[in-house]
A protein has these predicted regions:
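C-terminal cap of thioredoxin/glutaredoxin-like
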Residues: 5-25, 99, 103-183
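Structural alpha/beta surface segment adjacent to cysteine/selenocysteine redox centers
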Residues: 4, 8-111
Length: 183
């Protein structure tokens, strides 16, 4: 379970293909709305707790170095990810899913784009090969809305309280820093 607003989700995303190759596991990507999870569970973003946010910034940078991936704090964080996550729900199970997810994570956590700004978001979509108007139609469809809501509710029902959260069978692992246990 992931949300584009979570830098830890981005870091986990960069590693999961390797986990799948090494273990033979199939990764099932589950877009959820992290704000909905926080509301349902009474949790909050680490960014809302100054000391925790400062620590997490340093920790995320350490993990990016360990993983050998680009990572930059987004100067526009926090970002409302509702439309982006509906887009992920709309593309789930299609060939467009991974290119879309790649583009959104890159925009958020490598390029530091303001994805709440419509012209900026449209530019990111165009650069990734998506038609912004077609994207909005898909993201605003009732099917995408219902799918994202259902996945978010499923996450809460399974005990998810943050992102990323990975399940191996019924075993839950929270955070990108638990991938060694996932593997």
């Amino acid at each position: 379970f992931f949300d584009f607003g979570s830098p830890a989700s981005y870091l986990a995303y960069t590693q999961m293909d390797g986990v799948a190759k090494r273990t033979g596991a199939e990764i099932v990507w589950r877009p959820m709305l992290l704000g909905g999870v926080f509301k349902a569970t009474g949790n909050a973003s680490p960014a809302m707790v100054p000391a925790k946010g400062k620590w997490m910034n340093a920790d995320l940078a350490r993990f990016a170095r360990r993983y050998g991936v680009d990572f930059n704090r987004n100067p526009f964080f926090p970002v409302n990810t509702l439309v982006m996550m509906r887009g992920a729900a709309a593309f789930e199970g299609t060939p467009q899913f991974r290119p879309y997810v790649d583009a959104m994570f890159r925009a958020m956590w490598v390029d530091g784009k303001n994805m709440n700004d419509l012209p900026t978001a449209a530019g990111v979509l165009k650069a990734a090969g998506f038609d912004p108007a077609d994207f909005m139609a898909k993201a605003e469809s009732q099917g995408a809305k219902d799918r994202l809501k259902a996945t978010t509710e499923e996450a809460v029902a399974r005990g998810v309280f943050g992102a990323p959260t990975t399940f191996v069978g019924d075993h839950m692992f929270f955070g990108q820093d638990r991938l060694d246990f996932v593997e």
